[in-house]
């Protein structure tokens, strides 16, 4: 059987930033074909593709993403840790899934599929494409760094752009203009007055003012100010949208952007369980079966210069994926 740490290091040595995943796709597909899997390469866009590997189907699909955020960071072993871009998000997870599925197949279990998508870190176009395939699995185990716990659910997200307008003028005659920044600075602190929903499992809805843009030069009264908000959702979005509409009415313009609903996931006995605050491809893979989320590593080091995964946890993830699959198939 292949060594999961060596396999993860091989995957990490391939630069597969979002939009340039072809090297990782080629590596994974060849690895699977060499081990007797039926492999489907699904084109997502020019030069980019998902990998779907199957045998008998009608069971459990192990899935994660092959793309990473930039910049590329080469892998290295440092004591008990494997470091590098994608170590925990999510190439280490992909390696653990590959080895677990291969061990199951070698033991005669044919009801395991593998799905590796591109584009998760930016727009999830790979998952959207994968949901147009014709899977037969009953369960989907999505791999994200959950610290080797089964996720009980995941917060959703809602992007909102807020705009305030003024009237441009030369700053020497500022009284002839109207700064768009002033009403924005008055409005944003009142976000604290919103009655944000809570959920017994997912916790509190949160809001982050992610960007604030206004003006072009210090000697110009700015005519436009723009803030981008990110709400992390724990329930139905419509009551929150109505609150936001009332909050901004008469004071700002709103533009609603991407929306991902909050999710509750299937769990099984024998594992620690906890919710996660981040989103994933799960809402876009509805045809792949009842969702679970599990993976080694911590989201708190993902996307950082020192991203890592503990070698012991990575090895343990192979056993954990096998155990989850066997439990689901016996249900």
Regions found by a protein language model. Give the residues of each.
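Residue-level marker for buried hydrophobic side chains located in beta-strands
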Residues: 60-62, 141, 167
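Structural motif corresponding to alpha-helix initiation and N-cap regions
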Residues: 46-48, 124, 278-279
């Amino acid at each position: 059987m292949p060594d999961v740490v060596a396999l993860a290091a091989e995957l990490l040595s391939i630069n597969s930033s979002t939009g340039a995943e072809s090297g990782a796709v080629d590596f994974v597909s060849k690895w699977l074909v060499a081990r007797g899997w039926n492999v489907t390469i699904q084109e997502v866009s020019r030069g980019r593709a998902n990998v779907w590997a199957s045998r008998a189907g009608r069971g459990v699909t192990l899935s994660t993403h092959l793309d990473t955020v930039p910049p590329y960071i080469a892998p290295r072993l440092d004591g008990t840790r494997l470091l590098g871009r994608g170590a925990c998000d999510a190439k280490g997870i992909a390696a653990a899934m590959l080895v677990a599925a291969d061990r199951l197949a070698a033991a005669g279990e044919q009801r395991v599929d593998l799905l590796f998508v591109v584009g998760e870190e930016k727009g999830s176009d790979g998952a959207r494409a994968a949901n147009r395939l014709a899977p037969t699995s009953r369960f989907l185990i999505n791999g994200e760094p959950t610290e080797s716990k089964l996720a009980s659910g995941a917060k959703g997200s809602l992007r909102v752009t807020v705009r305030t307008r003024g009237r441009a003028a030369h700053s020497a005659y500022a009284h002839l203009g109207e700064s768009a920044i002033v009403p924005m600075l008055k409005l944003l602190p009142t976000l604290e007055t919103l009655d944000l929903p809570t959920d017994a499992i997912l916790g509190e809805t949160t809001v982050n003012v992610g960007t604030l843009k206004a003006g072009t030069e210090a000697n110009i009264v700015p005519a436009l100010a723009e803030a981008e908000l990110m709400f992390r959702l724990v329930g139905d979005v419509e009551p929150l949208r109505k609150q936001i509409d009332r909050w901004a009415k008469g004071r700002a313009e709103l533009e609603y952007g991407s929306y991902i609903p909050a999710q509750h996931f299937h769990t099984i006995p024998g594992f620690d369980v906890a919710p996660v605050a981040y989103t994933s491809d799960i809402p876009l893979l509805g045809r792949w079966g009842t969702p679970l989320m599990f993976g080694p590593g911590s989201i708190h080091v993902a996307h950082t210069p020192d991203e890592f995964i503990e070698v012991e946890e990575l090895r343990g993830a192979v056993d954990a994926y096998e155990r989850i699959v066997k439990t689901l198939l016996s249900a």
